[in-house]
Swiss-Prot record:
It is found in: Periplasm. Heme c 2 binds at H111, C130, C133, H134. This is Periplasmic nitrate reductase, electron transfer subunit. Electron transfer subunit of the periplasmic nitrate reductase complex NapAB. Receives electrons from the membrane-anchored tetraheme c-type NapC protein and transfers these to NapA subunit, thus allowing electron flow between membrane and periplasm. Essential for periplasmic nitrate reduction with nitrate as the terminal electron acceptor. The keyword tRNA-binding does not apply. Keywords: Electron transport, Heme, Iron, Metal-binding, Periplasm, Signal, Transport. The gene is napB. It comes from Neorhizobium galegae (Rhizobium galegae). GO terms for cellular component: periplasmic space.
Length: 163
């Protein structure tokens, strides 16, 4: 009878022991690994103070845009500006009729268009909340390295231009 062959029984025991040892070794190695830290912040269960607020850039100098159709950034303080359904403090300077007296740049004519491209007498409701697209700038260091290249740096360079 085959099932009573002692060498076969020994072989089955060896394979079982080998499988158990393999599971034990792999399980301990998997449990011993630590999860890599993606940031230097403490564990979420610890109470920590908030980082200080960044210093806003409020030099009133218009910044160059980084790409076509980028909304201009806000070069002045908007602290305390009321922006609600009933009031928009930005319009007191940037509305088309008031820019001559305020010296502020006029908002784009696209802000007076509805979704169908029809011109309106007043700012389109979908463009009324300025800070949805336009943001003030803060004096901070980048969170990640930036390898951005301006479009002019990516364009064609004639042979022999030395660049």
């Amino acid at each position: 009878m085959r099932s009573q062959d002692p060498s076969r029984r020994l072989s089955r025991r060896l394979w079982t022991l080998f499988a158990l040892a393999l599971c034990l070794v792999t399980g301990t190695v998997a449990l011993a690994q630590t999860v890599p830290q993606l940031s230097g912040r403490p564990s979420p269960m610890q109470n920590t103070g908030a980082d200080p607020l960044p210093r806003w850039i409020v030099d009133d100098i218009q910044k160059m845009r980084n790409y076509p159709d980028q909304p201009p950034v806000i070069p002045h303080s908007i602290e305390g500006y009321q922006l609600s359904v009933n009031t928009n403090r930005c319009m007191s300077c940037h509305r088309r009729e008031l820019t001559e007296g305020s010296g502020a740049p006029m908002i784009s004519v696209t802000h007076y268009m509805n979704r169908e491209g029809q011109m309106l007498a007043d700012v389109s409701p979908r463009r009324y909340f300025c800070t949805a697209c336009h943001v003030p700038q803060a004096d901070t260091r980048p969170l990640v390295d930036n390898t951005f290249k301006d479009m002019s740096e990516l364009g064609f360079k004639p042979a022999g231009s030395g660049q």
